[in-house]
Swiss-Prot record:
InterPro entries: Bacillithiol_biosynth_BshC, CC_BshC, Rossmann-like_BshC. GO terms for molecular function: ligase activity. Residues 462-533 form a coiled coil. It is an enzyme of class 6 (ligase). Pfam families: CC_BshC, Rossmann-like_BshC. Its EC number is 6.-.-.-. Belongs to the BshC family. Keywords: Coiled coil, Ligase. HAMAP family: BshC. This is Putative cysteine ligase BshC.
């Protein structure tokens, strides 16, 4: 399969913070622990082995065995769960929401990056074991972010009748209503072996499991179980009890807010945007009905928009009795993950890494080893036919990533039989007016303003003429312009990265297991570039 790649800066889709992190800019070195290079994992292993509470392993295995009890578990996943008992076993984690039928393509890229990094670590450090973990965001409550997927330019949306949707953790929501989505999906995906696998996976996942959490675990296991992926839903009381001391310090001392405030000021002073601003208390109170913020006022604690309240002593007792009711938010969830897992590295997208970079001082204050942070692989999938079309249109890979009007203007200028670039004329005009400025200074300086006004007017006139000629030439080259726009629209649905829009089923129905196999082969988590992968020839 032909593979092409471009650098992340050339895509124009990554923020300055992430690009500077990838280039190991010195000013950012205080915001992370170790840069994710294979040689640096040795020290990370040593540190995590020393700092991790290995007694948690027993509870972790028990919880995983319970969560996998109704699934067909592959030999590789079973071996990985069992291996977690050993002090020489470590994890690599990616986290993701419970998007309907995995959501956009980058769900696959996240998990494949994670699996492939564990393989590389095993080669480099064979005396240890490395387990790829998918941390399901079962406690998120933003239902509108996850209740749809895009296939063939159409949006397949789940209208959940559960009135708790959007109010409490999505993992516990009923899968009711997904039979309607299944009918529409089945009609769209058609027939054939690959289509039957997709329909079967959707049907067994959502129509034979009662909760979104169980359904998502089934689907992720169907796709990635044979590679040894281990899926964690961390809301279990047996795991939450190990986070009690950290939740206590958050409630009483507002530790995450206190520790990250200075970091945010430093990040801001370097000219970067802040990804997440912490609240005073970065915890939710979670029940079957609600997930609402915990607020402190005058030494007492309240649950936002409810009648629930406690004194300090009462909330600490509630924490001791029901740790599962205290749900971390985006600022505290990373700490929880690193407390309960023997983890070395977190793999995420640019937005995720941006908020992780805010947290190092918080981890240090809580005496938890800060993991290495690795940007997940990114890719664009194209057909051989699309690649041929691009080459015929003489569009480079880099040009594909331009804004559409920039791409079209550039190509029209290039293929036009007349020169529509007036840069030379503008430079000549500026030179001519320089003589007039000199003349005005020598005669009467009050004329300088008039000269300037005339210069601006004439430059604007040239601009206007250039745009009119370009527009006329676009009309003349209408077919060419339409082919360019059509190709880019196909590869960048909704003028966005394909990986953030298109569901994997659109490609799986065509290429089946080849899709997963080729992604496993081609996506190198330690290779810092954006891949363009070509499937099939016509």
């Amino acid at each position: 399969m032909p593979t092409n790649c471009i650098s992340y800066p050339e895509t124009n889709y990554f923020t300055p913070l992430i690009l500077d992190y990838l280039s190991e800019k010195k000013e950012l070195s205080n915001f992370y622990h170790r840069f994710p290079e294979i040689e640096n994992f040795g020290a990370q292993i040593t540190e995590k082995k020393k700092s991790y509470d290995h007694t948690i392993r027993k509870d972790l295995i028990q919880v995983l065995n319970d969560q996998y009890s109704k699934l067909t578990v592959s030999e590789n996943t079973r071996a990985n769960i069992d291996a977690l008992e050993s002090k020489n076993t470590f994890t690599v984690v990616t986290g993701h929401q419970l998007n309907l039928f995995t959501g956009p393509l980058y769900f696959l890229y996240k998990i494949i990056s994670t699996i492939n990094l564990t393989k590389k670590l095993k080669e480099k450090y064979p005396e240890n074991n490395f387990v790829p973990i998918y941390w399901m965001a079962t406690e998120d409550h933003d239902f509108e972010e996850i209740n749809f997927f895009n296939l063939n330019g159409k949006k397949f949306k789940w209208n959940n009748a559960d009135d708790r949707a959007g109010k409490t953790a999505v993992g516990g929501l009923s899968t009711e209503g997904l039979d309607e989505v299944f009918k529409l999906f089945s009609a769209e995906i058609g027939g054939g072996e690959n289509a039957e696998f997709l329909k079967s996976t959707f049907e067994k996942g959502y129509l034979e499991h009662d909760t979104l959490s169980d359904a998502t675990r089934f689907i992720a296991n169907e796709i990635f179980g044979k590679y040894g992926l281990v899926i964690v839903a961390a809301g279990d009381k047996r795991l939450k009890k190990h986070f009690i001391p950290n939740v206590g310090s958050e409630l009483v001392e507002h530790s995450s807010h206190k520790q990250t405030t200075e970091t945010l000021q430093k990040i801001n002073s370097l000219g970067y945007n802040i990804q997440v601003n912490p609240r005073d208390i970065n915890l939710f109170y979670l029940t079957d009905e609600i997930r609402e913020r915990i607020i402190e006022r005058d030494g007492n604690y309240f649950v936002h928009e409810t009648e629930i309240s406690w004194t300090k002593e009462e909330i600490l007792q509630e924490l001791k009795d029901h740790p599962e009711r205290f749900s971390p938010n985006v600022m505290t969830r990373p700490l929880y993950q690193e407390v309960i897992l023997p983890n070395l590295c977190y793999i995420g997208g640019g937005g995720e890494l941006a908020y992780w970079l805010e947290l190092k001082s918080y981890f240090e204050a809580e005496n938890v080893t800060f993991p290495m942070l690795l940007l997940r692989n990114s890719a664009m999938l194209q057909t051989g036919k699309q690649n041929d079309k691009r080459e015929k249109l003489k569009i480079s890979i880099q040009e594909l990533f331009l804004k559409q009007h920039e791409l079209i203007n550039r190509k029209v200028r290039k293929i036009s039989d007349i020169d529509i670039d007036f840069s030379g004329q503008k430079e000549h005009l500026v030179e001519q007016f320089q003589h007039m400025y000199d003349l005005a200074e020598k005669t009467d300086e009050s004329f300088i303003g008039a000269v300037k006004a005339q210069e601006v007017k004439q430059l604007k006139g040239l601009d206007h003429l250039e745009k009119r000629l370009l527009k006329a030439q676009k009309r003349k080259l209408k077919d060419e312009v339409e082919r360019i726009a059509e190709l880019q629209n196909d590869l960048f649905p909704n003028r966005s990265l394909q990986e953030r829009q298109t569901n994997f089923s659109e490609f799986y129905v065509e290429y089946g297991e080849e899709l997963i196999n080729k992604l496993m082969e081609e996506l190198d988590p330690l290779e810092s570039n954006f891949k363009i992968l070509t499937f099939g020839r016509e």
